[in-house]
């Protein structure tokens, strides 16, 4: 097997948010094993350093970016810092998210609402603003935004989270439409479905996690969506069904 086949992302730079645990951590490691240099974004320096050790063991390198995604100006500065150091960005994984309050909408506190919108939706919009020019400089820019099946279900008490993910999906689809014919950038969404993560355990405390797919299984699908050979854009990869789906508006 050639090195290109074994490490198809060699020489590429990938930014992953929420990189210190769950799907984000597994994705960062999968991309590293495929040869990418990882720009790992997370809130906790200690957890980022642990990830760095794991990436080195995987045979790759990382740049650690401690950042609270509610820090809008910090996100705005991120793109410039990446450009100065690397000149471009090849892959963006918008994974970081919070569950928010599992509360009737009429009882959600404004700060809880604002925090969920800030992390799950506004941060990704600011990341688009910050990273879009860098991704367009790549010969095969790829962006994957991690969504949720909650975006399609009007389920009691899930309103805050569902609204943020529905907004994220339209953000991603609009971005994909805007760049489709003017650059090599491809933008897609992924629904991981029920996965063995801390967030899932918080939402379903009585569930047996051993019955759920692991973050590593989901990460393998995200990796495929980041390869230059993956050319779909504006689509949703539904991990539970292993299907790539086009969005169908109401008649």
Region annotations inferred by a language model:
Residues 34-50:
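Conserved glycine-rich Rossmann-like NAD(P)H-binding loop of the short-chain dehydrogenase/reductase
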Residues 148:
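Residue(s) in the substrate-gating loop at a strand-loop-helix junction
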Residues 128, 164:
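Active-site helix of classical SDR
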Residues 185, 189-190, 197, 205-251:
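C-terminal helical subdomain
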Residues 103-105, 112-117:
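Substrate-binding pocket helix/loop in short-chain dehydrogenase/reductase
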Residues 13, 20-22:
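Conserved glycine-rich cofactor-binding loop
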Residues 133, 177-181:
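Alpha-helical segment proximal to the catalytic Tyr-Lys
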